[in-house]
From Swiss-Prot:
It is an enzyme of class 2 (transferase). It catalyses: O-acetyl-L-serine + hydrogen sulfide = L-cysteine + acetate. Pyridoxal 5'-phosphate binds at N147, G251, T252, G253, G254, T255, S339. Its cofactor is pyridoxal 5'-phosphate. GO terms for molecular function: cysteine synthase activity. Belongs to the cysteine synthase/cystathionine beta-synthase family. Pfam families: PALP. It is found in: Plastid, Chloroplast stroma; Plastid, Chromoplast. This is Cysteine synthase, chloroplastic/chromoplastic. Acts as a major cysteine synthase. Pathway: Amino-acid biosynthesis; L-cysteine biosynthesis; L-cysteine from L-serine: step 2/2.
Length: 392
C-alpha cells in the first residue's frame, strides 16, 4: 500500500460505521423528536439502497491486495486503519429538564475503546516520518494514565516496537492487564505524585535506556494535530456545522484544542467548554489534588492545551462523574468511563441554561466503561455479583 500521512486513512468520506445521513435544511425547522424520526427514515432508506448496491462502499482504508487477486474489499489492512470515524448519538433520558440538545461523540467505539487510539497512532507515525524512531530498534517510552498507553501499545505491537510505560498505581487494574496483554512493559509510580510522578519516572527510564524515545503526549504537536485533522472534521460533518457548543474533558489538552480550533475556524461563535475534576481544578484557579476521574485533571497545565481556544471551565466532582456514568448505562445504554460521566455532567449543566435553548451541544465520551470494572464506578455491582450463588 502506498505511504499515507498520519491521518489520511481517517478522512475517507464514508465508512462502514459512518451513518449515511443526508442533511436537509427542512429538518432544522422540526422539533427534536420529529428531527430524529426524519433522520432515521432518511438513514434507513439510504441503508437499503446501499444493500442493493455494494460496489460504492468505501471503508476507512479500502484494501488493496493485488497479489491475492482481490481489490477494493471493505476490509482494513491492519488494526490501525480502524481508528476514527466514530459515531455520534443523542442523549435522550439523562437530559430531562434540558433546553438544548446533547449529542455524544462515541470514542468508546475506537478499536481499543478510547480516544487515545488516535494519538497513539499519530505520535508513533509522526516520529517515524521524521526519522526519529525505527521499528525493531527504537524503544518507546511514555507516561500514561492508561488509555494513551493502550493506544500506543496496540500500535507498537503491530509495528514491532518495544514499549515501556509508567503509570500511577491508582489507575484501574484493567489498564495494567490490557497494557501487558499488548506486550508493553509497565512501571507503576506513587499515586500521590499523580501524572507528574509518572512523567519523572519515564524521564529516568529514558536516560538509562539505549535507543529510547519519549513520545511526550502532553507536549507533542502530533496530539492536537490528529484531532484537528480527524475528530474535529468528523464532528463538523456529523452535525452539518450546526454545533453550537463543544464540551470535552481536559487531560493532555489535545482533544479540546484540536477539535475546538478546527470548528472555531469555521464557526467563530462556537463556545468551547473544558471539564476538570473539582478536586484538582487548576484551570479554574484551584490547586492540584487526588481525584477519581481517570484520564483528566493531570494536576498541571499541559503544553498541548491552547488556553485561547477554551471559553469556560466546569469543575465536576468525582462523585458526580461516577453517578452520571452509572446513569448513562442505566438510562441510555451507554457503558462509559468516569471521564465520560464528568463530560456528560458538564454538558447537562450547560444544556439547562436558558440562554442555550434550541442549541446543539457536542460532548466527547473518551473511553469505554469495561475498562473501569475494578473501580468505584462498579463497586456495588461487583460486590453483588461476587456474592451470587447458583440456584438449586
Amino acid at each position: 500500500m502506498a505511504a499515507t500521512s498520519s491521518s489520511a486513512f481517517l478522512l475517507n468520506p464514508l465508512t462502514s460505521r459512518h451513518r449515511p445521513f443526508k442533511y436537509s435544511p427542512e429538518l432544522s425547522s422540526l422539533s427534536l423528536s420529529s428531527r430524529k424520526a426524519a433522520a432515521f427514515d432518511v438513514s434507513s432508506a439510504a441503508f437499503t439502497l446501499k444493500r442493493q448496491s455494494r460496489s460504492d462502499v468505501v471503508c476507512k482504508a479500502v484494501s488493496i491486495k493485488p497479489e491475492a487477486g482481490v481489490e477494493g474489499l471493505n476490509i482494513a489492512d491492519n488494526a490501525a486503519q480502524l481508528i476514527g470515524k466514530t459515531p455520534m448519538v443523542y442523549l435522550n433520558n439523562v437530559v430531562k429538564g434540558c433546553v438544548a440538545s446533547v449529542a455524544a461523540k462515541l470514542e468508546i467505539m475506537e478499536p481499543c475503546c478510547s480516544v487515545k487510539d488516535r494519538i497513539g497512532y499519530s505520535m508513533i507515525t509522526d516520529a517515524e516520518e521524521k526519522g526519529l524512531i525505527t521499528p525493531g530498534k527504537s524503544v518507546l517510552v511514555e507516561s500514561t494514565s492508561g488509555n494513551t498507553g493502550i493506544g500506543l501499545a496496540f500500535i507498537a505491537a503491530s509495528k514491532g516496537y518495544k514499549l515501556i510505560l509508567t503509570m500511577p498505581a491508582s489507575m484501574s487494574l484493567e489498564r495494567r492487564v490490557l497494557l501487558r496483554a499488548f506486550g508493553a512493559e509497565l512501571v507503576l509510580t506513587e499515586p500521590a505524585k499523580g501524572m507528574t510522578g509518572a512523567i519523572q519516572k519515564a524521564e529516568e527510564i529514558l536516560k538509562k535506556t539505549p535507543n529510547s524515545y519519549m513520545l511526550q503526549q502532553f507536549d507533542n504537536p502530533a496530539n492536537p494535530k490528529i484531532h484537528y485533522e480527524t475528530t474535529g472534521p468528523e464532528i463538523w460533518e456529523d452535525t452539518r456545522g450546526k454545533i453550537d457548543i463543544l464540551v470535552a474533558g481536559i487531560g493532555t489538552g489535545g482533544t479540546i484544542t484540536g477539535v475546538g480550533r478546527f470548528i472555531k475556524e469555521r464557526k467563530p461563535e462556537l463556545k468551547v467548554i473544558g471539564v476538570e475534576p473539582t478536586e484538582s481544578a487548576i484551570l479554574s484557579g484551584g490547586k492540584p489534588g487526588p481525584h477519581k476521574i481517570q484520564g483528566i485533571g493531570a494536576g498541571f497545565v499541559p503544553k498541548n492545551l491552547d488556553l485561547a481556544i477554551v471559553d469556560e471551565y466546569i469543575a465536576i466532582s468525582s462523585e458526580e462523574a461516577i453517578e452520571t456514568s452509572k446513569q448513562l448505562a442505566l438510562q441510555e445504554g451507554l457503558l462509559v468511563g468516569i471521564s465520560s460521566g464528568a463530560a456528560a455532567a458538564a454538558a447537562i449543566q450547560v444544556a439547562k441554561r436558558p440562554e442555550n435553548a434550541g442549541k446543539l451541544i457536542a460532548v466527547v465520551f473518551p473511553s469505554f466503561g469495561e475498562r473501569y470494572l475494578s473501580t468505584q464506578l462498579f463497586q456495588s455491582i461487583r460486590e453483588e455479583c461476587e456474592q451470587m450463588q447458583p440456584e438449586l
